[in-house]
Amino acid sequence: MYKLLKKSGKARRGEFTTPHGVIQTPVFMNVGTLAAIKGAVSSMDLKEIGCQVELSNTYHLHLRPGDEVVKKMGGLHKFMNWDRPILTDSGGFQVFSLSKIRKIQEEGVYFNSHIDGRKIFMGPEESMRIQSNLASTIAMAFDECVENPAPREYVEKSVERTTRWLHRCKDEMNRLNSLPDTINNKQMLFGINQGGTYEDIRIEHAKTIAKMDLDGYAIGGLAVGESHEDMYRIIDAVVPHLPEDKPIYLMGVGIPSNILEAVDRGVDFFDCVLPARNGRHAHVFTKEGKINLLNAKFELDDRPIDEGCQCPACKHYTRSYIRHLFKAKEMLAMRLCVLHNLYFYNNLMEEIRDAIDGDYFKEYKERKLKEWGGRA
């Protein structure tokens, strides 16, 4: 259940109560594709750096180790030793982005595994069953993420099919949640708004799915090559047509400036691999924007990554030392930078929540954008 606590302009401060705890929103979900953050970050680390929600990938876990294995091990929470909320995506995005050979039909999608090439089928019911086996807190509906740009006629047909799939997802989840051997029989379902960059298609789809009384609503199919202006335009068009008493999730968007702009437009949930991926390549976020620790100017820099930061890396190590670790190809380098970046994001969201609570979010946003100077 979502409770709206405060608004600052259109920015929303809320609480989302789940079977695995209360999520303070706006929130950034830390992405652990295979039930772990790439970069040797443990579930204990995630708690230390303020992670509220972990996100895992249905498609990848279905292939390895297999959702049946996870179910036999008691579900994702027990498997990865994490007692806070977990969101699993539906696998739809990976089916359409990773598989070069796929066939879309009304019942679902036939595609080839990106690992061994074997033929796999996934539809709404299969996605729900896999996510039920994983026993995540929040399951995402199975949808088609169309390429951008895509012909209007195709987008219209795709959105209609995605709506039919959403009804099937809801029916299947209700069935699964009623079974005696279901680990999490209070699993929640978020629907996904699609429609490419066509505002009218997006709006009609938002109105349609808003009637279904789901636990939350996502805006999908963005951050796939469109301009930031197009992204903001679509968010502006869609958000007013989604229920105000449900959380709104902008999928796959994680550039800090994009997060601020989306919060300013009423978005509550975010996720992205960006902070962890950047950290693994020595790109770290600071109050002044993003820097590359491999640059020669940091060789003798005895400052922490970001002065004043309370993450494990900044409390104990210098830019010079971490740069040396990267040059020496030591795994500790990746770990420290991933921890720092995730802490930066989680702390950013805490500052955003405080700014909305204090009704100074607009001023906060403008100050942060000025500090970053287009470097974040």
Swiss-Prot record:
Pathway info: tRNA modification; tRNA-queuosine biosynthesis
InterPro entries with a match to the protein in the record: ArchSynthase1/Queuine_TRR, TGT, TGT-like_sf, tRNA_ribo_trans-like
One example of a Gene Ontology biological process annotation: queuosine biosynthetic process
Keyword Lyase: no
One term under GO cellular component: cytosol
Reaction(s) this enzyme catalyzes, per UniProt: 7-aminomethyl-7-carbaguanine + guanosine(34) in tRNA = 7-aminomethyl-7-carbaguanosine(34) in tRNA + guanine
Family of the protein in this entry: Belongs to the queuine tRNA-ribosyltransferase family.
Purpose of the protein: Catalyzes the base-exchange of a guanine (G) residue with the queuine precursor 7-aminomethyl-7-deazaguanine (PreQ1) at position 34 (anticodon wobble position) in tRNAs with GU(N) anticodons (tRNA-Asp, -Asn, -His and -Tyr). Catalysis occurs through a double-displacement mechanism. The nucleophile active site attacks the C1' of nucleotide 34 to detach the guanine base from the RNA, forming a covalent enzyme-RNA intermediate. The proton acceptor active site deprotonates the incoming PreQ1, allowing a nucleophilic attack on the C1' of the ribose to form the product.
Descriptive protein name: Queuine tRNA-ribosyltransferase
Species annotation: Clostridium botulinum (strain Loch Maree / Type A3)
